[in-house]
C-alpha cells in the first residue's frame, strides 16, 4: 500500500460543549454576496474582458443579488478601470452594493479609496492571513504582529472613510481573517474583536466578519463547531455580521455553508456554479435551490437556469457539468427502469390528486421551477425498464399504452438499446412502436368496409359488417354481425382461418384534438392453439376503423412468428 498518506497532519477539531447548531433549521435566506467577478474571474484560464464582466454583472442583478464583489481595483489597471466603468457608467442600481477587495496594506488601501469615489453603496473588504501555517511559513510573525497588520489597516480605512461617509456614501466594512479554518479559534476571536474595535463597530453600524474556508481542510460539522465557538466567544457579537466564504477542496462547500448558517452565520459569499480557485467556491445556485426545495424562499431568481448557464459558459469559457445540481443537462433525467416507472406514477398521482405539494419520486424539484421541461426527464438506454418507453410514448407522442402492454413494448425497446449500445431518442422509440404495432400490413389488409346498424323492438343494437380483405395476393369478401362494430368485424373474419383468436382486451383514446382528431385503439388477442397473447394497435380518423386495424395488427403479428 502507498504510505503517502502518513505525511499529512490530521485536522484537530475544536472542542465545544453543548453545541446547539445541529438542532437548528434554515428558515430564511442569508444575505447573498457574489464573488464571481473577483474570486471566480481570477481562477479563469482567460479572465473576462470588460464587456463580459458587464454582462455577468447585469445577470447577477437580474437574479437578485444585492451585494456583488466587483474586483480588486488596486491589483491592476484593468481591475481599476472596470470598477470605474461600473460607477461612472451608471450600471449599479441604487439597491445594489458593490464590494471591493484589498489586502491590509497601506498603498493598496489608498488606491482602493480612489477607485470607489462616486459610488453610492460600497463594502470595503480587507484581509490578512491569520493561520498557524501562514504565520510560520509565509510571514514569519507571531500573533501580535499579524494582529497589528489588521488593526493598522482598520485604522487607516476608518480614517479615510469618514469624508466619503459625510459626503453621503453608504460605506461599510468587511474583514476576513484569511485561512480562518487553520487559525486557532481563540486567536481568531481576538483578532476579529480587535478589528471591530478599531473600526468602531456598533449594533447600528455592524462590520462584516467574513470567515473563509480559504482551503477546505476539515469536515463541515467540524467547521460548524468552530463557528458556533467563535460566535459564543466574540465579545462584540452584536456588532458583527458573520459571513461565510466556503471553498470546495474536499467537495463539501455546500454542506459547510449550510452547517455554517445553522451555527450562526448570516451571510454567504458564493459564485454561480461554484467557479473559483482550485476546486472552486461554494455554488450559489445549489445552495439557494436547496433552500427552495425545503420551502424556504432564497430570494434569488433561478427560474430561467438555462439562460443563466448560457451566459456563464459564454463569459467564463467554462462548461457547466452534465451532473451539476439543478442546472446540468442530465439532472432531470432518469435512465433506470425503476426510476422511470416511479416518476411516471408520481406524475399520474399529481394529476389525479391535484395536490399542492411536489410529490414525485426521484425528482426533488419541479423542473419547471428552473425553467426546464418535462419532456427530457425520461431517457432510454439499456438500463431502462418497461415504464420508460411507455412514458415517452405518452408524454412525447400522446399514446397512452395499456398497463399490460408496457412489458412487451419495453422489451422491444431494450432489445434495440442493447443492439446499439447507447441511448436511443424518443423519435427512434416512436419508430419502433409504429414498426412493431401500427405499420403491420401483412399478410392481412383491410381494403374496404361498411357498417349498418339496426335496433330491434327491445331496443338492442345490432351491427352488420361488410368488408374486403387482402391476404398476400388473394382478395376476398367477409361479413358478420354483432352487438357492436368490433364484435361484428371479429365475427366476420373468424371464418377466414382466423377463428383461433379470441378477444381479451380493448381500449382506445384520442391522440389529437379538434375536428381532425385521430384515435388509437389497442387490442389484445389470444391464440387458442398455444395460448400466446398478441397486442395490436390501430390508428384512424374514423372511430370505428381504428379497432379493426388494431385487430388485424395483432393477427398479423401472430402470423409473423
Predicted features, each with a name:
Residues 2-8, 32, 48-67, 83-89, ...:
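Alpha/beta enzyme core
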Residues 1-36, 295-479, 515-518:
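A mid-to-C-terminal "edge-of-domain" accessory segment
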Residues 531-561:
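Mixed-charge, glycine-accented linear interaction segment located at domain edges/termini
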Residues 218-352:
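Catalytic alpha/beta core domains of metabolic enzymes, predominantly
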Residues 1-108, 372, 377-380, 384, ...:
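N-terminal capping/small domains of soluble enzymes
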Residues 134, 211-213, 241, 269-277, ...:
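Short beta-alpha connecting loops at secondary-structure transitions
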Residues 463-469, 511-535:
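Positively charged, aromatic-enriched nucleic acid-contacting surfaces
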Residues 39, 43, 73-77, 131-133, ...:
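Short, small-residue-enriched loops and turns at beta-alpha junctions
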